[in-house]
Amino acid sequence: MLVPPEMIAVQSKLIYQMNKYCADRVQTRKAQIHKTIQEVCRVVQDVLKEVEVQEPRFISSLNDYNGRYDGLEVVSPTEFEIIIYLNQMGVLNFVDDGTLPGCAVLKLSDGRKRSMSLWVEFITASGYLSARKIRSRFQTLVAQACDKCSYRDSVKMIADTTEVKLRIRERIIVQITPAFKCAGLWPRSASHWPLPQIPWPHPNIVSEVKTEGFDMLSKECIALQGKNSAMEGDAWVLSFTEAENKLLQGGCRRRCLSILKTLRDRHLDLPGNPVTSYVMKTLLLYECEKHPREMEWDENCMGDRINGIFLQLISCLQCRRCPHYFLPNMDLFKGKSPGALENASKQVWRLTRIMLTNSRCLEEL
């Protein structure tokens, strides 16, 4: 099919605009974040070294692989989460019966094996390994380590939370989250994935993702708040970061994500934080399902994909619901106020309208 010359010209201009935006705004954001990460990891590694001296079961897994750190997630340019992988689930079974959206529990396979667990004192009378008990112990150790470490003048524990959160030089927030890696397992609550009628991702990628497995994090779960569930303190939050990152390889998907995060940081960092980087990442995964062919992720299509994601975002904000990609029963907007979602919807619509009507909009955004 012949494409009219004027369409080719418009497309070329858009590709030029996208490339320029990546070179200017996106790379500047990445460089600033990279610099902050180096500072954050120096401080956290020092704190965790002190923790390990006090309690050898909490071994730091924060290692530098040519400037990349395993288990480090950028929440925003001034907020980070660092996952510390714990050893030996051992005699514990993974239980995911769907009663706790976004969460699961670890239960002793046999009551007689209690003493064989590395984490024996954190196992409840009912045989569950309590995420909250482990986190509480870890929080105490980190608080003591902050007072002893080399950076004690610039790092402080954030009070009034059960999470392990540090404030570095008054401007950077880091959450340190204990976790177990669950390789070779796939949760029942995500068993519907991939959808049979959608030809993405390729079966080989699906197999790799499921073999890689997922993580179980010791952190507060928004989905359980206010339910007074007896299991709430024992439950572990399911995380699919590695799976998500693997799915976003190929084509311009990673590039799209970088542009989305940059636009989010510059224009959608709103009161109540309804539009997180993780929401953008989730909507990008749904866009991959809507456009399963690789040719639809060529750089010529990048503008269409980004506009499509912003239109999805408006729809989610207006419906006040954004389902987790792997766990659709879990709503990423849970706990956000209707006012914050309404305000965000208006802001996103303004931004989308500019992007749809002005081919040179990225010069100003």
From Swiss-Prot:
InterPro entries: Mab-21-like_nuc_Trfase, Mab-21_HhH/H2TH-like, MAB21L/cGLR. Disulfide bonds: none annotated. Pfam families: Mab-21 (PF03281), Mab-21_C (PF20266). It comes from the Eukaryota. Belongs to the mab-21 family. This is Protein mab-21. It comes from Anopheles gambiae.
